[in-house]
């Protein structure tokens, strides 16, 4: 008998980190919750990272996911912004890992391909497919929608990921 698996998807960002929680049983997906954790742009970097940490820790504690999926970052022309995003991503990976969850990573193109069928697409296409895949899904803004898409990507890929990890562990 299959067990329902609760997945949290995290879309890291220093200003806004999106999160989305879904339940998956076999091929079925069920929306649980979504939102964003924000940091105060007037605060120093360390304080902002603490805000992200504390907010994500509360979400993980309250929703009790079984697995986490985090979007990989891309390198842009602004090296300072890329480094800050990398630090926010570190928090996004640390929080579920410290809670004992396995953490999986997905490239943005893989997330889009899992949700809309192609690796390059518009935000509106993601929003539309989220509503088709999970009609009861509620999300405010692109960050929460992206986080739900990341969770769905993991739900579609989790069997293969688990097998690869077992084989690598030897």
UniProtKB/Swiss-Prot annotation:
Residues reported to bind Mg(2+) 2: 71
Keywords for the protein's UniProt record, in alphabetical order: Cytoplasm, DNA damage, DNA recombination, DNA repair, DNA-binding, Endonuclease, Hydrolase, Magnesium, Metal-binding, Nuclease
GO molecular function, one term: crossover junction DNA endonuclease activity
Catalytically driven reaction(s): Endonucleolytic cleavage at a junction such as a reciprocal single-stranded crossover between two homologous DNA duplexes (Holliday junction)
Annotated PROSITE patterns: RUVC
Pfam families, alphabetized: RuvC
EC number, UniProt record: 3.1.21.10
Cofactor(s) essential for the protein: Mg(2+)
Residues that coordinate or bind Mg(2+) 1: 11, 143
Enzyme type, top EC level: hydrolase
Biological-process GO terms, alphabetical: DNA recombination; DNA repair
Function summary: The RuvA-RuvB-RuvC complex processes Holliday junction (HJ) DNA during genetic recombination and DNA repair. Endonuclease that resolves HJ intermediates. Cleaves cruciform DNA by making single-stranded nicks across the HJ at symmetrical positions within the homologous arms, yielding a 5'-phosphate and a 3'-hydroxyl group; requires a central core of homology in the junction. The consensus cleavage sequence is 5'-(A/T)TT(C/G)-3'. Cleavage occurs on the 3'-side of the TT dinucleotide at the point of strand exchange.
Family: Belongs to the RuvC family.
Subunit structure: Homodimer which binds Holliday junction (HJ) DNA. The HJ becomes 2-fold symmetrical on binding to RuvC with unstacked arms; it has a different conformation from HJ DNA in complex with RuvA. In the full resolvosome a probable DNA-RuvA(4)-RuvB(12)-RuvC(2) complex forms which resolves the HJ.
UniProt-recorded name of the protein: Crossover junction endodeoxyribonuclease RuvC
Gene from which this protein is expressed: ruvC
């Amino acid at each position: 008998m299959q067990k329902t698996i609760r997945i949290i998807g995290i879309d890291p960002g220093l200003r806004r980190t999106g999160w989305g929680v879904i339940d998956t049983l076999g091929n079925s997906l069920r929306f649980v919750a979504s939102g964003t954790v924000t940091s105060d742009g007037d605060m120093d970097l360390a304080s902002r990272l603490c805000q992200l940490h504390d907010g994500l820790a509360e979400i993980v504690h309250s929703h009790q996911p079984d697995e986490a999926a985090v979007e990989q970052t891309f390198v842009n022309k602004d090296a300072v912004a890329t480094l800050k995003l990398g630090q926010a991503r570190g928090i996004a990976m640390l929080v579920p890992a410290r809670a004992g969850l396995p953490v999986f990573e997905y490239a943005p193109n893989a997330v889009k391909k899992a949700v809309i069928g192609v690796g390059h697409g518009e935000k509106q296409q993601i929003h539309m497919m989220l509503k088709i895949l999970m009609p009861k899904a509620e999300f405010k803004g692109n960050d929460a929608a992206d986080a739900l898409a990341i969770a769905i990507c993991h739900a579609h890929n989790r069997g293969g990921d688990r097998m690869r990890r077992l084989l690598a562990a030897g």
